[in-house]
Swiss-Prot record:
Assembly and binders: Part of the 50S ribosomal subunit.
Name of this protein: Large ribosomal subunit protein uL30
Gene Ontology cellular component terms for the protein in this record: cytosolic large ribosomal subunit
HAMAP family in the record: Ribosomal_uL30_B
Similarity section: Belongs to the universal ribosomal protein uL30 family.
Organism: Aster yellows witches'-broom phytoplasma (strain AYWB)
GO MF terms, alphabetically ordered: structural constituent of ribosome
Amino acid sequence: MKLKITLTKSLIACRFNQIKTAHCLGLKKINNQVIKDDTPAIHGMIKTISHLVVVEKVSYTKEQK
């Protein structure tokens, strides 16, 4: 299972660790989307910036690239 993570709010005025977490996930601008594996490490990152992102579960295959 994969997670589609969308940055919905700005990183301006966020704490430094929240900005770094968003960048590590690959989110730099509003409405950026990334697809990541559903792992405990990713869940921890999402928990850190949960007020800034929207998370959806997707079933992802190679044909959908």
